[in-house]
Amino acid sequence: MNRPHSATGDRPLALVDEHAHAWSPKTARARFRKGLTGPTAGVAAGHTQANLISVPADWAYDMLLFCTRNPQPCPVLDVTDAGSWTTVLADGADLRTDLPRYRVWRDGELVDEPSDVREHWRDDLVTFLIGCSFTFEWALAAAGVPIRHVEQGRNVPMYVTSRACRPAGRLRGPMVVSMRPVPPAHLSAAIHESSLLPAVHGSPVHCGDPSALGIDDLDRPDFGEAVYREPDDIPVFWACGVTPQAAVMASRPPFALTHAPGQMFLTDARDEQYRVA
């Protein structure tokens, strides 16, 4: 699978605002609607973030089945009616304008990365909102786990793996993972805290040697940006909601809209709503 060209290239993406952790989700969405872009890690503390993918209605069942068969990378939080750009997860939000950046796909090829997709919108699009691991970073931080990409003001690194997802109808593709370097003393806390939030990917799929996932070079992520790792840090990999984008690249549906990796939809839902005992 070829790495898609990004409009941002390899230049660092600063966090959207140094005070963004204190924003409400509504404030964040309003700023994104006005054109603010950038990774949303650390934005709107304590609120659930979501990946987005919109597909034509005649592909929606395949996508729903794909997510159902692959719940760790694709945990569904909401599915809209065809043509709807609203969601029960965020009152008054517009899914066409309220993310920092989107991706437009035609026949599996990335053709645009706008900050507003109203001109690309179609009445037959069904939108899936899928849980994002940025949500559990607050729990990790509260447990003392350093979040390296946030510390460094970078997007989280994401990698296409050698693990195939279960196919569904016309959709197939590999699992994508996000990686966070974790000091050994904090590894058990990272695993435990994330495991309590299965709706946003839950516990890691792998800790340690990246070659076990078919990843050759941690400094060359397929999406996002490489992060500096301390010498004793352990690379920890979580299933990632960019997996549907990898399925789009592999399966080549005629049209799809997605979020740009790392630039998520901010919901009004509190992370506690998805926390299990």
UniProtKB/Swiss-Prot annotation:
Known EC number: 4.2.1.-
Keyword Lyase: yes
Name of one Pfam family that matches: D-Glu_cyclase
The keyword Transmembrane belongs to this UniProt entry's keyword annotation: no
Top-level taxon in the UniProt lineage: Bacteria
InterPro entries (UniProt xref): D-Glu_cyclase, Putative_hydro-lyase, UPF0317
Family that this chain belongs to: Belongs to the D-glutamate cyclase family.
Protein name: Putative hydro-lyase SCO1412
Organism: Streptomyces coelicolor (strain ATCC BAA-471 / A3(2) / M145)
